[in-house]
């Protein structure tokens, strides 16, 4: 399984940069991101909602000429009128499976509230096929419908065009970053954090875009063989043509080096695969090779909790604060 076209083998910074460009170019192609079409965001404010006592502005941007991405924008000064900060770091929190942007705020309220207290603009978007972007078979406001996604339908169609669900998701996050970093209230620091499918989006987005200055993934960092090839019942968004010939999770992590990177794992998380945490740590060992080339020994941070497939969050707030100080 390690006979990969882009297995990590760099020994110097120069070799790392050559490898990084080569793998990114290959991922740009096999994910179908090269088929996406750029357009201006044409941002639209729609309304303001209150979720778990947090004030959330509902916005939308265009990520392709006929593709719209809705997101919630939460501002520190709306939660705390005493906030005098004029420029803010930005934290994108992609959702996992089982809901959209609303579920992010509902399930990660403390993390989001802490980030707002620390001055972040917090942004919770809908991924293609989820939330307000579900295709017609899954549309509806019933709880069971809201928890569904259309990733299988999307993959079945987009694979015929040489595209993938994760490729489209990363493209959308890149276009969202374009818009957010251009805001007058942005201070230029961008972080991304997600659980499960949100962790997947975070890892891939951070691997493909150096503008992400700090990345947090929970419940998504493990070797592909045990967690995807041997567990093919996982969501269709995990699968990219030729990926299993190209690179493994450790290589995706190496693309993030030397930026601050935080991985949270549950001891009992079944998605880790049959060897459990060993399927996580062996991939992190690959990632650490890249960090060591840059003499970076602090990252990646690996936080392990005793639970299953769940977000715990211990140490994440401190991680983000230190990452900002590093900049």
Give the positions of each predicted feature.
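N-terminal cap/lid segment of alpha/beta-hydrolase-fold proteins
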Residues: 29-86
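Cap/lid segment of the alpha/beta-hydrolase catalytic domain
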Residues: 84-87, 92-182, 226-230
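Mobile cap/lid helix-loop segments that gate and shape the active-site cleft of serine hydrolases
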Residues: 152-153, 157-163, 175, 212-254, ...
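Active-site loop->helix "elbow" adjoining a glycine-rich segment at hydrolase catalytic centers
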Residues: 165, 196-200
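Short glycine-enriched nucleophile-adjacent loop
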Residues: 173, 199-210
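Alpha/beta-hydrolase fold nucleophile elbow
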Residues: 185-196
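Conserved strand-to-loop "acid loop" that flanks and positions the catalytic carboxylate
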Residues: 257-276, 306
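C-terminal catalytic histidine-bearing segment of alpha/beta-hydrolase fold enzymes
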Residues: 285-327
């Amino acid at each position: 399984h390690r006979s990969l076209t882009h297995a990590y083998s760099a020994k110097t910074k120069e070799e790392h940069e050559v490898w990084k460009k080569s793998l990114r170019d290959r991922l740009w192609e096999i994910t179908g991101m090269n088929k996406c079409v750029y357009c201006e965001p044409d941002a639209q404010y729609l309304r303001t909602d209150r979720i778990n006592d947090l004030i959330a502005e509902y916005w939308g941007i265009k990520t392709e000429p006929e593709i719209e991405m809705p997101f919630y924008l939460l501002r520190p000064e709306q939660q705390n009128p005493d906030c005098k900060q004029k420029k803010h770091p930005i934290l994108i929190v992609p959702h996992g499976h089982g809901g959209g942007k609303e579920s992010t705020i509902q399930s990660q309220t403390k993390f989001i509230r802490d980030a707002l207290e620390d001055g972040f603009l917090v942004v919770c978007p809908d991924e293609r096929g989820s939330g307000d972007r579900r295709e017609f078979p899954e549309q509806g406001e019933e709880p069971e419908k809201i928890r569904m996604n259309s990733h299988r339908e999307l993959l079945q169609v987009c694979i015929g065009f040489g595209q993938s669900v994760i490729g489209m998701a990363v493209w959308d996050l890149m276009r969202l970053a374009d818009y957010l970093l251009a805001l007058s209230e942005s201070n230029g620091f961008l972080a991304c954090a997600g659980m499960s499918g949100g962790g997947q989006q975070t890892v891939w987005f951070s691997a493909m875009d150096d503008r992400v200055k700090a990345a947090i993934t929970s419940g998504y960092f493990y070797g592909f063989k045990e967690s995807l090839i041997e567990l093919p019942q996982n969501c269709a968004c995990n699968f990219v043509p030729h990926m299993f010939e190209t690179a493994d999770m450790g290589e995706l992590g190496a693309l993030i080096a030397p930026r601050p990177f935080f991985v949270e794992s549950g001891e009992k998380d079944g998605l880790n695969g049959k060897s459990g945490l060993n399927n996580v740590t062996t991939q992190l060992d690959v990632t650490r090779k890249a960090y060591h080339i840059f003499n970076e020994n602090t990252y990646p941070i690996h936080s392990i909790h005793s639970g299953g497939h769940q977000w715990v969050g211990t140490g994440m707030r401190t991680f983000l604060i230190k990452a900002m100080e590093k900049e």
